[in-house]
Amino acid sequence: MPAYRSRTTTHGRNMAGARGLWRATGMKDGDFGKPIIAVVNSFTQFVPGHVHLKDLGQLVAREIEAAGGVAKEFNTIAVDDGIAMGHDGMLYSLPSREIIADSVEYMVNAHCADAMVCISNCDKITPGMLMASLRLNIPTVFVSGGPMEAGKVVMHGKKVALDLVDAMVAAADDKISDEDVATIERSACPTCGSCSGMFTANSMNCLTEALGLSLPGNGSTLATHSDRKRLFVEAGHLIVDITRRYYEQDDENVLPRNIASKQAFENAMALDIAMGGSTNTVLHILAAAYEGEIDFNLDDIDQLSRRVPCLSKVAPAKQDVHMEDVHRAGGIMRILGELDRGGLINRDCPTVHAPTLGDAIDRWDITRTNSETVREFFRAAPGGVPTQVAFSQSSRWDELDMDRENGVIRSVEKPFSKDGGLAVLKGNIALDGCIVKTAGVDESILKFTGPAKVYESQDSAVKAILSNEVVAGDVVVIRYEGPKGGPGMQEMLYPTSYLKSKGLGKVCALITDGRFSGGTSGLSIGHVSPEAANGGTIGLVRNGDTIAIDIPNRTIELMLSEGELAARRVSQDAAGWKPAEHRKRKVTTALKAYAAFATSADLGAVRKLPE
């Protein structure tokens, strides 16, 4: 039977000093011996996805204490990728994931906490906490802040649903008036919560459901809806239950590494591919698997991508569909239910809230349950009132979206496409692989060949696109933006958004050793590995070289002979693998420290110490 970790600081005469300090935090005689549960919050006023979390940590803490535990709350940092986008702030986004994971480990291990509830929401916070949970392997429940309501506005007599990406695209489109841009800007992000499409934050919060570490509805219940409060209340009780099961009943099935097994990771990626999630999820899932010592890699994702169809298209892939619509169609449990019918997931994986994922699906899939409570839960609708307050409205749709042929979530027999929403490509320009969000690629350019236009930084590419240097048929290559080369592997949302605003979204391709925002669509291929700074072939591309992309056959090739590539490599080795242009970005000691240990994207861009 494992001993409570917290006994190290709460029991024994020699711990009188530690107990004295615990007493100063409010603990009483009767609290020593109870499980000490860390409430890992990420409240900040910088991020709309986290601005409403301030009181939610204490909501969970009260429920933990009502269930017989001791709750102690602390915060991690949280970077808003949208605000950090398009300038040197984006260099810090991906490295912040490691800082978050480390900070959770530091606090939990320093104070010998027995378990934790992770209150996350946005892009790097959920992955960072997920990495920490698998690293620590103590009982953990995830509950996120929830998605933002989609913006709604009437423009030129037509009601339009909006999100963050619409504001970016409109601002770069010379054909849209200043007045209309201002209207879009003011309407795109109306409430607290993670940005309203199937971007990185919402994708990751959905994946925690498939991994079995969060409650049903975690990924899709709106931040503003009163139904979401139940998830926080239930998380507080649930964590005490599974903590006792582990420490008092020796039930290791409740530990993160036993819940988030390789089979669970396969379930999560099957979901990701089916719902057309952000390409960043690949990076984060690989990193989480690494922390959990789980043998799950890019080849596994490639195999899944070849057999899992695309069952849902959400913004940015389908501009008028947002997370509130996914919830109305049954949320993540409905998508998992459709995959289950097709024999595409493992039903036997345990979860924190049900004996198996299959049991959870049978209870929560709206197409197979008779529970009116479940059906009412998924009728939760947006309130349509701008607010930064959680649980502030209780609107309901009149009916659910149960249409399996033409609805937001479709059946395996009637998918949006037989190929899934994500694909792994390989070829001489990406020997270790690269990623494309196929759900956002127009069918007309699934195969694409064109001349390279090479840029040594995101900034140079943006300048070229806005000055009309890039034309239809081009393959834009942005390099030295990988984990080491950036450093920090910046997101390329601005280049892809500007291509769309220039009318080039369906007639150009973009490849990079950097990564993309979950808001990116179009033929945007990221995570090219090895990256240029590590001697990857992307560093050998020259203007005018022909690049051939074939998504159906999963290939990407630089159309040069082996002899020419070898000659260029000799030349580049002599010159050094660094950008040809002088970049003005300031690379601080903190960023250099990340770059020194960062692995390539195909390994999740995690840090590895030299052996």
Swiss-Prot record:
It catalyses: (2R)-2,3-dihydroxy-3-methylbutanoate = 3-methyl-2-oxobutanoate + H2O; (2R,3R)-2,3-dihydroxy-3-methylpentanoate = (S)-3-methyl-2-oxopentanoate + H2O. Keywords: 2Fe-2S, Amino-acid biosynthesis, Branched-chain amino acid biosynthesis, Iron, Iron-sulfur, Lyase, Magnesium, Metal-binding. The modification N6-carboxylysine is found at K124. Mg(2+) binds at D81, D123, K124, E491. GO terms for cellular component: cytosol. Its cofactor is [2Fe-2S] cluster; Mg(2+). Homodimer. This is Dihydroxy-acid dehydratase. It comes from Allorhizobium ampelinum (strain ATCC BAA-846 / DSM 112012 / S4). The lineage of its organism: Bacteria, Pseudomonadati, Pseudomonadota, Alphaproteobacteria, Hyphomicrobiales.
